[in-house]
């Protein structure tokens, strides 16, 4: 097993919307082969952070750096920041400043994949087709942007086989091989959630961002989701960044937890460290920190 190292570094991130400060001076890291949970009350700024990382928003201030390949490429971060370009890619790996990149470039070049709070499958396509469409970019390159595909040349046929093999692997992983030819919209809700994650994994992401993947799931479906995310972490060594309100899921699978409240980080550590942090308890109870002990005793915590 390779040692964990930083894949994502968020440094002094601030996002303002006019006079509203949604995120203020936030810094944290996400590591290779670990699950990092971003938690906090509604309106704490969690989804805004995701939108900054994935290129939907351009942060007001701060740096969002992502690395893949050899961790030694981090040594070039200062030089990249001083330049005017968004990335540095070489034989040893890539280094990216996500705040300088368009959302499609973050996904394609920096290899950041994302799911949303609301399921966004292609409901009329089959389950298999949803996984194949996620591999559109390599298939288009192999097709020569049409000509190789039209004539069925060997390079394109090889890419097709590879795409189907990858899709089949993920169908097996999420237990949906027998539903491969069914419309994705016909699947039960929990299966749709897992299919959406499998589709994201078909892009071979360095960083997988999941926005409330357990929302609306029953206990059995939540357990299946947890097993899938642990498998992604342990077998594929993908860095997972997770927003979730289901604390049973968070505490079961997370290696690292960051807590936001009113756009600011109030805690950062392991599950045990965070759940015993007075700042976190105060935020959850909606009281000042000095009132935590009295209120916790009153409610039986």
Provide a role label for each language-model segment:
Residues 39-41:
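The feature captures the beta-strand-to-loop junction immediately N-terminal to the Walker
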